[in-house]
């Protein structure tokens, strides 16, 4: 057996560790290095830079508390390897692929490097197919592409995580699909809640959970998205599955990269972000795609700092997305959830060649009415409804019904709202909005359109 390449720690600066290899054989960039203390505690670093004088600069994936200069470091000879395949379903892992649900992992299971190749053009699939989510506002106005990348944009507390949880629930229960949930720099409580909610809903055995929470070092938060992606890629490439990859929150991935960049001494670029922002984002996003063997559909929650969409972090994410779902505080203030702004959100799939002529026409009519309603808001605020023409009054009444009807009770929020969650098929969604647009429900009060499933629920409420 070959003797392992070993070095010694010569400097520790927070999560940055410098290691000198006297053998003259430096580990490659992105290799994983290990330190094991007599207490059996294991530390893992990733090589980030060769800084000269036989020394490598590494980023630690765990807290460096307990380390000291002079400790022996071992080069594993490969990148960070994480478990993949059936063994990860129903389980919860950290960035290094160690189980954190206090259950054992099978010995000798398959593992893959977190730094996988980007699929070539020949391997990629080029046709577009819609993924039905059962959420009316999404399916009608911002349809998601199977194998596409979707961004959920919103400030703090507008409902990004609840929307992600509902999507996981709907895909598992209605489509029997596999999901990988990656918690990047978010609250530990949310991960804990998600685990037990999914267990209670019976969808945990179709999901792998990977967490690098906000209390962990920046190295873990920067790499945990790649750990989740590696697990999803295995299902796509080796088991020919259609997989959903949820990343909550992609902004924290950028934020962790910014911290690491500063620790490595790089000069920051705009707004203090790392100069390699676009490169790091591209390396992650380009691996998320449909291939001839299967697809990875990615839903990424994107925190928008100070609700500013021009901030470099959300702006860089925008360029990779097929659909953007914008959650708006003003919609949430009206008590309408999911708090999606239908006029700010968009999808490249809303095209008659993809969704069909009927769906496209209904969606455009809904958008036109909501746009006209927005234009009339100032007149209504200053002069009141009485100054509007009869045609505009009709548009306002229908727009308010549509706005209320775009709300929907979620299964994962049942215990908070007390309203039974609903999954609405795309055909029912189109039929329901057609009824409102045609004026068949003009006599109905607008309040009964709130938190209904399909239009049949509204009619049943009216008849009561």
Swiss-Prot record:
* Top-level taxonomic group: Bacteria
Q: What is its EC number?
A: 7.1.2.2
Name used for this protein in its record: ATP synthase subunit beta
What InterPro entries does UniProt report for this protein, alphabetically? AAA+_ATPase, ATP-synt_VA_C, ATP_synth_F1_bsu, ATPase_a/bsu_AS, ATPase_alpha/beta_chains, ATPase_F1/V1/A1_a/bsu_N, ATPase_F1/V1/A1_a/bsu_N_sf, ATPase_F1/V1/A1_a/bsu_nucl-bd
> Binding of ATP: at which residues?
154-161
Report the sequence similarity comment from the record.
Belongs to the ATPase alpha/beta chains family.
- Known NCBIfam families for this protein? atpD (TIGR01039)
Q: Look up keyword Translocase and say if it applies.
A: yes
- Quaternary state and partners of this protein? F-type ATPases have 2 components, CF(1) - the catalytic core - and CF(0) - the membrane proton channel. CF(1) has five subunits: alpha(3), beta(3), gamma(1), delta(1), epsilon(1). CF(0) has three main subunits: a(1), b(2) and c(9-12). The alpha and beta chains form an alternating ring which encloses part of the gamma chain. CF(1) is attached to CF(0) by a central stalk formed by the gamma and epsilon chains, while a peripheral stalk is formed by the delta and b chains.
Record membrane topology: Peripheral membrane protein
Under Gene Ontology molecular function, one entry of this record is: ATP binding
Localisation: Cell membrane
PROSITE patterns referenced in this protein's UniProt entry, alphabetically:
ATPASE_ALPHA_BETA
Keyword set, alphabetical order: ATP synthesis, ATP-binding, Cell membrane, CF(1), Hydrogen ion transport, Ion transport, Membrane, Nucleotide-binding, Translocase, Transport
Q: Which SMART domains match?
A: AAA
State whether keyword Nucleotide-binding applies: yes
- Record GO cellular component, one term: proton-transporting ATP synthase complex
Catalysed reaction, written as an equation: ATP + H2O + 4 H(+)(in) = ADP + phosphate + 5 H(+)(out)
Record's function text: Produces ATP from ADP in the presence of a proton gradient across the membrane. The catalytic sites are hosted primarily by the beta subunits.
- Name the predominant localization: membrane
């Amino acid at each position: 057996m070959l003797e392992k390449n070993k070095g010694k720690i010569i400097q520790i600066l927070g999560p940055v560790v410098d290691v000198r290899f006297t053998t003259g054989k430096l580990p490659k960039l992105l290799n994983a290095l290990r330190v094991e203390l007599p207490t059996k505690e294991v530390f893992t670093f990733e090589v980030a830079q060769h800084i000269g004088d036989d020394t490598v600069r590494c980023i630690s994936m765990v807290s460096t508390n307990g380390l000291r200069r002079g400790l022996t470091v071992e080069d594993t000879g490969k990148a960070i390897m994480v478990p993949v395949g059936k063994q990860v379903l129903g389980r919860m892992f950290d960035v290094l692929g160690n189980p954190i649900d206090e259950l054992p992992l099978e010995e000798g299971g398959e593992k893959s490097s977190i730094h996988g190749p980007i699929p070539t053009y020949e391997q990629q699939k080029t046709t577009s197919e819609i993924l039905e989510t059962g959420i009316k506002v999404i399916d009608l106005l911002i349809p998601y592409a199977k194998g596409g990348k979707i961004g959920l944009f919103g400030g703090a507390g507008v409902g990004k995580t609840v929307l992600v949880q509902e999507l996981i629930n709907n895909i598992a229960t209605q489509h029997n699909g596999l999901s990988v949930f990656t918690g990047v720099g978010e609250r530990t409580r949310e991960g804990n809640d998600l685990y037990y909610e999914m267990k209670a809903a019976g969808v945990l055995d179709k999901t792998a959970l990977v967490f690098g929470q906000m209390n962990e070092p920046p190295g873990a938060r920067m790499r945990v998205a790649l750990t989740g992606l590696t697990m999803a890629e295995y299902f796509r490439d080796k088991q020919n599955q259609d997989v959903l990859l949820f990343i909550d929150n992609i902004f924290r991935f950028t934020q962790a990269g910014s911290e690491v960049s500063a620790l490595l001494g790089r000069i920051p670029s705009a707004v203090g972000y790392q100069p390699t922002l676009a490169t790091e984002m591209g390396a992650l996003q380009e691996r998320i795609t449909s291939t001839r063997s299967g697809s990875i559909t990615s839903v990424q929650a994107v925190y928008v700092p100070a609700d500013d969409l021009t901030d470099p972090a959300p702006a860089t994410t925008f360029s990779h997305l097929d659909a953007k779902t914008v959650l708006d505080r003003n919609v949430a203030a009206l008590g309408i959830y999911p708090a999606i702004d239908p006029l700010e959100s968009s999808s490249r799939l809303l095209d008659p060649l993809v969704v069909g002529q009927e769906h496209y026409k209904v969606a455009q009519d809904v958008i036109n009415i909501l746009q006209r309603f927005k234009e009339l808001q100032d007149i209504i605020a200053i002069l009141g409804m009485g100054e509007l023409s009869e045609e505009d009054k009709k548009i306002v009444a229908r727009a308010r019904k549509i706005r209320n009807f775009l709300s929907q009770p979620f299964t994962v929020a049942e215990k908070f709202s007390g309203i039974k969650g609903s999954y609405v098929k795309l055909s029912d969604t189109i039929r329901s909005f057609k009824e409102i647009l045609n004026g068949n429900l003009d006599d109905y009060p607008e309040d009964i359109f709130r938190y209904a499933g399909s239009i049949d629920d509204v009619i049943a409420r009216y008849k009561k």
